């Protein structure tokens, strides 16, 4: 397991890096005192979870020896890595001007330029021990996250999770949906007394819907639309794509079609989840 220690000058992108690491599965803690690193690592060792911790000028150890001792006290399962982010002086000044945030050392009545320079001196002991130093001066937020994924996972894109969920319009549209497709115009198994108590997960309902050409056409055209734009969505630094399929009650048509789409993209090697809001409500 890895204990990634993220440090660097304020405004260089530590928060962005920590969010990217969290998306990669790291357990992330912002501004944890160095002396508590071994305790955090021990609490995660049994769970087999890598961790990432940010350290800035506010929680710097008083001496390099304290940092070294904390590294020695880490459980054997953890391999510490120190990532140091930096940017040139003018870039840091511009970023502070854009965000209008206060520098951590501004309480010392220093100008922004002086605070940046003093911070560099205070962080030098960590910078000199860094396993990787990254200059973010010319990087966007997305480029920094992409670089970290490439370095740590060996791939550029974050793995996108596709979520296909069915719902009933009479219960409301899911607020977390990126795309909403209305299938209320398709043939409705509800009007068959034998099928009415069943759901789109049952074979007789699936057989009923499978007999209709318009159902096949809708599934084909919907998956074609998603396939067309999926490459761009995968490179857009997002973790989830939620596709909501709605019918009147959320019991038959939407359930069947959500499952068909989920199975298709799962067979193409995508990371897929499916859920059925109305059916889950009935269980609870």
UniProtKB/Swiss-Prot annotation:
Coiled-coil region(s): none
Binding residue positions for GTP: 56-59
Entry keyword set: ATP-binding, GTP-binding, Nucleotide-binding, RNA-binding
InterPro entries (alphabetical): P-loop_NTPase, RapZ-like, RapZ-like_N, RapZ_C
ATP-binding in keyword set: yes
Xref: SUPFAM superfamilies: P-loop containing nucleoside triphosphate hydrolases
Binding residues for ATP: 8-15
Molecular-function GO terms, alphabetical: ATP binding; GTP binding; RNA binding
Region ranges (RNA-binding): 266-284
UniProt KW Hydrolase keyword: no
NCBIfam families: PRK05416.1
Function, in words: Modulates the synthesis of GlmS, by affecting the processing and stability of the regulatory small RNA GlmZ. When glucosamine-6-phosphate (GlcN6P) concentrations are high in the cell, RapZ binds GlmZ and targets it to cleavage by RNase E. Consequently, GlmZ is inactivated and unable to activate GlmS synthesis. Under low GlcN6P concentrations, RapZ is sequestered and inactivated by an other regulatory small RNA, GlmY, preventing GlmZ degradation and leading to synthesis of GlmS.
Family: Belongs to the RapZ-like family. RapZ subfamily.
Family annotation (PANTHER family): RNASE ADAPTER PROTEIN RAPZ
Self-association state and partner proteins as the record states: Homotrimer.
Name of the protein in question: RNase adapter protein RapZ
Species this protein is from: Klebsiella oxytoca
Annotated gene: rapZ
